[in-house]
């Protein structure tokens, strides 16, 4: 009987950290471009908010490669990059099928490599102005924290 109790307690203590850690994942990320904020949501409630910088032409939906716009719409996190030119980067699933189709109709490239990332490792970048090529930038400390909240496939809604 004692061995069963010891095994049960050991089992609980071995699995508890994984259970607790898993409970901290975000359900969704919301980017409000006009407010320059990134919100982490869990069970429909905002649990954390961050100030952001956007693309150098932030108004409007990204249409083509090089336009400096940050896309708008529903996407998801499809990759975590821990060895990035921007400290840590979370790749966004832009372009989606609709973005690709719209670009094909106009015979242009929709662009790509849109990410939530930290500050540049090569140049001195700040969040005081919109400086990215269409990405969403936060501080290095913040991207470290954000990367712990999200998993691959976490939805991200980017709105005006």
What are these regions (language model features)?
Residues 2-10:
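Sec-dependent signal peptide recognition
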Residues 23-27, 54-78, 98-102, 119, ...:
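N-terminal post-signal-peptidase region of extra-cytosolic proteins
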Residues 22-56:
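A structural motif detector for short, solvent-exposed N-terminal "entry" segments of globular domains
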Residues 28, 49-51, 74, 113, ...:
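Well-ordered beta-strand positions in beta-sheet-rich domains
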Residues 81-160:
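Exported/periplasmic cell-wall-interacting domains
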Residues 13-14:
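Hydrophobic alpha-helical transmembrane segments of integral membrane proteins
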């Amino acid at each position: 009987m004692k061995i069963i109790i010891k095994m049960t307690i050991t089992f609980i203590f071995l699995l508890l950290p994984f259970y607790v850690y898993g409970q901290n994942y975000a359900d969704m990320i919301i980017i409000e471009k006009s407010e320059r904020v990134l919100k982490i949501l869990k069970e429909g409630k905002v649990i954390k908010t961050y100030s952001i910088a956007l693309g150098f032409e932030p108004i409007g939906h990204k249409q083509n490669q090089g336009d400096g716009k940050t896309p708008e719409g529903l996407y998801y996190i499809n990759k975590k990059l821990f060895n990035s030119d921007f400290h840590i980067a979370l790749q966004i699933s832009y372009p989606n099928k609709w973005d690709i189709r719209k670009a094909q109709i106009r015979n242009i490239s929709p662009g790509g490599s849109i990410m939530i990332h930290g500050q540049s490792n090569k140049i001195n970048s700040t969040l005081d102005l919109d400086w990215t090529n269409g990405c969403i930038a936060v501080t290095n400390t913040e991207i470290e924290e954000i990367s712990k909240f999200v998993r691959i496939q976490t939805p991200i809604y980017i709105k005006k």
